[in-house]
């Protein structure tokens, strides 16, 4: 995950932070401990929490539009999971889903990143039995199953021109009926969109109301 300096988090339109920006531990005994999802590059702790509030709202909107029940037993992949924020958001929304989160856990854009910290976040929030974090990247990951939903946030732009190969690899982990929710800073029509539409049908484009640069969340389906 990599947030850049030109994201104007102070002007974001958000609701109460405890409603959107926080994930509440499902086990009351864990309330004395706090999850830590990191401070993004060129950001502060408070600003990063506001960014996550908006991201959670947008992905929750995307999940609500998919033809799945909240208690369906889904297989979800979080490609570039960082410290597990989006993995936990999906586990909170889809109550019986099993989530696999992959990351190198080495990117300098997210301070104190580690698989151990991601696992601890899931444990604190009560999702450790349904989230499995693996140290890998999209170019080396070889799953033995196909996924019902693939999620990713602010990952693919980091790959430069190699992102097109990454898009193709992502497509190989899907089956007919898979949905992809991908948030990123740019989706260029002649390159990114053209490549993605070879494999997926774009159903929706969700954007923040203002102040989030060129960020957009694409909701796509595999047919």
Regions found by a protein language model. Name each.
Residues 177-185:
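Conserved beta-strand signature within the Rossmann-like core of class I S-adenosyl-L-methionine
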Residues 83-95:
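Conserved SAM-binding loop of SAM-dependent methyltransferases across substrates and taxa
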Residues 30-66:
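Class I SAM-dependent methyltransferase Rossmann-like catalytic core
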Residues 139-150:
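A short acidic, Gly/Pro-enriched loop at the edge of an enzyme's catalytic core
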Residues 164-176:
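A short glycine-rich, Lys/Arg-flanked "PGG" loop and its adjoining helix->strand segment in the class I
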Residues 149-162:
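A short SAM/SAH-binding and catalytic strip from SAM-dependent methyltransferases
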Residues 112-140:
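S-adenosyl-L-methionine
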Residues 72-82:
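Conserved class I S-adenosyl-L-methionine
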């Amino acid at each position: 995950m990599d947030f850049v300096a030109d994201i104007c988090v102070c002007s974001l339109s958000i609701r109460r932070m405890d409603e959107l920006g926080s994930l509440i531990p499902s086990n009351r005994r864990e309330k004395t401990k706090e999850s830590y999802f990191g401070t993004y590059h060129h950001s502060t702790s408070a600003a990063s929490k506001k960014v996550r509030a908006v991201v959670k709202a947008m992905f929750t909107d995307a999940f609500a539009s998919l033809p799945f029940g909240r208690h369906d037993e889904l297989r979800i992949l979080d490609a570039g999971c960082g410290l597990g924020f989006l993995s936990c958001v999906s586990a909170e929304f889809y109550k019986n889903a099993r989530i696999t989160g992959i990351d190198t856990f080495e990117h300098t854009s997210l301070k104190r990143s580690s698989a151990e910290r991601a696992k601890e976040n899931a444990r604190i929030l009560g999702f450790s039995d349904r989230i499995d974090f693996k140290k890998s990247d999209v170019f080396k990951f070889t799953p033995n199953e196909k996924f019902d939903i693939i999620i990713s946030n602010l990952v693919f732009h980091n790959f430069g021109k190699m992102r097109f190969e990454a898009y193709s690899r992502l497509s190989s982990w899907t089956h007919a009926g898979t949905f992809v929710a991908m948030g990123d800073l740019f989706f260029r029509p002649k390159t990114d969109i053209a490549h993605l539409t070879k494999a997926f049908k774009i159903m929706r484009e969700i954007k923040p109301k203002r102040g989030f640069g060129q960020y957009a969340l694409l909701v796509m389906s595999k047919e």
